[in-house]
């Protein structure tokens, strides 16, 4: 991939996702979208318990409509998270998938920094 979009609304931000539907329903994850185009995430409920991720895969973030962004990354585990963040109502919808599994996900989000 020669050029990967990383929308300014996402790049350099920490986004807290709270899942209301899907395999991680009830969990909250913080995603740090670094300026260098990588993302790391952790279980926000495990704060101070070493819950930080050890990997930083590249991500893409593209504005698809005013205040609406598609974000995706492929983790070393083989799972891809692809979500749409709607900054107008702070809702998130998307899919967590692997070569064998596919799960729709929904929730809410907040930008924490």
Where on the chain are the PLM-derived regions?
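Tryptophan-anchored aromatic micro-motifs
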Residues: 1-25
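Contiguous, well-ordered beta-strand patches that form the walls/edges
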Residues: 47-85
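Beta-sheet ligand-binding and adhesion/scaffold domains
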Residues: 5, 70-113
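Generic "edge-of-domain/loop-turn" microfeature
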Residues: 22-24, 38, 46-48, 66-68, ...
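Short, hydrophobic/aromatic-rich segments at coil-to-beta transitions
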Residues: 9-16, 36-40, 65-72, 92-93
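N-terminal glycine/threonine-rich, aromatic-flanked beta-hairpin/loop signature
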Residues: 25-59, 98
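A structural detector for beta-sheet-dominated domains
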Residues: 18-20, 34, 42, 74, ...
């Amino acid at each position: 991939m020669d050029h990967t979009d990383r929308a300014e609304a996402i790049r350099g931000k920490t986004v807290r996702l709270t899942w209301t539907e899907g395999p991680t329903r009830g969990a909250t994850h913080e995603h740090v979208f670094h300026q260098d185009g990588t993302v790391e995430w952790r279980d926000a409920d495990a704060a101070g318990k070493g819950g930080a991720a050890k990997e930083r895969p590249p991500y893409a973030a593209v504005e698809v409509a005013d205040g609406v962004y598609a974000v995706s990354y492929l983790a070393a585990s083989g799972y891809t998270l692809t979500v749409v963040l709607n900054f107008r109502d702070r809702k998130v919808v998307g899919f967590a998938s692997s070569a064998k599994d596919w799960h729709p996900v929904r929730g809410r989000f907040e930008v924490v920094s």
